[in-house]
């Protein structure tokens, strides 16, 4: 067996990021062959990933990546097991690499990412293989939980990540004056992250769900001894409150509590003689 030098161990560690003892063992097991040692560590990572497949991975980070022209964007959640790993350079760099790949390839789901090849920084491994390698390197389960992709050639896509990278949102807007919408789009992304709407407008709330909620409110009012003639008004009031909570355009605008989001959008349309519609949005909170 060839003698393993400290320089060889350091070189392998620089290439793979694995621990010194793991690198020494890999070189010992492969007779000092650097490429075989790299493969050995990757296989070890895959084996560890299999062992940790059932582990809970609720820490991690939310990442948003936008095209330079803000016509496309990606929001994703990458999970690990501890906040310590989530804040490390290896994990944050890997998250950034995934978001860049997803954006460049216009990937619409986490599952569609798995067979795609990463760049030279990850030796061209597929995303699936690279996650296993990262699991071996960091000693924790690494999992791409979810991903959302927006493409809006007739408008803009904008995103927001709350400090700490545990909460984020992405929104797409259709407009005939995209050059004017940048700040408004950023405000909307922040609104979505902070206020957690579910739909853009009332039409997005299923009618059967509203009917069910109305019946629940009606029964609650009757059980509280409210008079029959007042029940309908009570139900209507509670439904209005529900809409204000879950419908984006009905929410109070976070930058001006005297305005609803719908009024803020109307002001922009009138001031700029522009068309403007919120097409869709996605909000991720870590560990949901």
Curated annotation (Swiss-Prot):
It comes from the Bacteria. GO terms for cellular component: cytoplasm. Associates with the EF-Tu.GDP complex and induces the exchange of GDP to GTP. It remains bound to the aminoacyl-tRNA.EF-Tu.GTP complex up to the GTP hydrolysis stage on the ribosome. The lineage of its organism: Bacteria, Pseudomonadati, Chlorobiota, Chlorobiia, Chlorobiales. The keyword Nucleus does not apply. This is Elongation factor Ts. It is found in: Cytoplasm. Keywords: Cytoplasm, Elongation factor, Protein biosynthesis. It holds the Pfam family EF_TS. Residues 82-85 are annotated as: Involved in Mg(2+) ion dislocation from EF-Tu. InterPro entries: EF-Ts_dimer_sf, Transl_elong_EFTs/EF1B, Transl_elong_EFTs/EF1B_dimer, Transl_elong_Ts_CS, UBA-like_sf. Its main location: cytoplasm. One of its GO terms (molecular function) is translation elongation factor activity. Belongs to the EF-Ts family.
């Amino acid at each position: 067996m060839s003698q393993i030098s400290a320089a060889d161990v350091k070189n392998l560690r620089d290439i793979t990021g694995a621990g010194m003892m793991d690198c020494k063992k890999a070189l010992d097991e492969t007779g000092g062959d650097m490429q075989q040692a790299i493969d050995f560590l990757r296989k070890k990572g895959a084996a560890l990933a299999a062992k940790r497949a059932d582990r809970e991975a609720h820490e991690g980070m939310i990442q948003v990546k936008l095209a330079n022209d803000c016509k496309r964007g990606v929001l994703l959640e990458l999970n690990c097991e501890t906040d310590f790993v989530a804040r490390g350079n290896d994990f944050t760099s890997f998250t950034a690499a995934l978001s860049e790949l997803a954006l460049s390839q216009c990937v619409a789901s986490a599952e569609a990412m798995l067979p795609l090849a990463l760049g030279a920084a990850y030796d061209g491994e597929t995303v699936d293989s690279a996650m296993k390698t990262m699991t071996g390197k960091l000693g924790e389960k690494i999992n791409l939980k979810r991903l959302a992709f927006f493409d809006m050639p007739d408008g803009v896509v904008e995103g927001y990540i709350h400090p700490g990278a545990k909460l984020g949102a992405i929104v797409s807007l259709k407009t005939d004056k995209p050059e004017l919408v940048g700040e408004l789009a950023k405000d909307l992304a922040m609104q979505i992250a902070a206020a957690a709407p579910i739909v853009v407008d009332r039409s997005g709330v299923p009618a059967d769900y509203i009917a069910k909620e109305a019946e629940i409110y009606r029964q609650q009012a009757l059980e509280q001894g409210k008079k029959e003639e007042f029940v309908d008004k009570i139900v209507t009031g509670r439904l209005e409150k529900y809409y204000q909570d879950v419908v984006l355009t009905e929410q109070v605008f976070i930058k001006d509590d005297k305005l609803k989001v719908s009024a803020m959008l109307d002001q922009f349309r009138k001031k700029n003689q522009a068309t403007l519609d919120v097409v869709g949005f996605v909000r991720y909170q870590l560990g949901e």
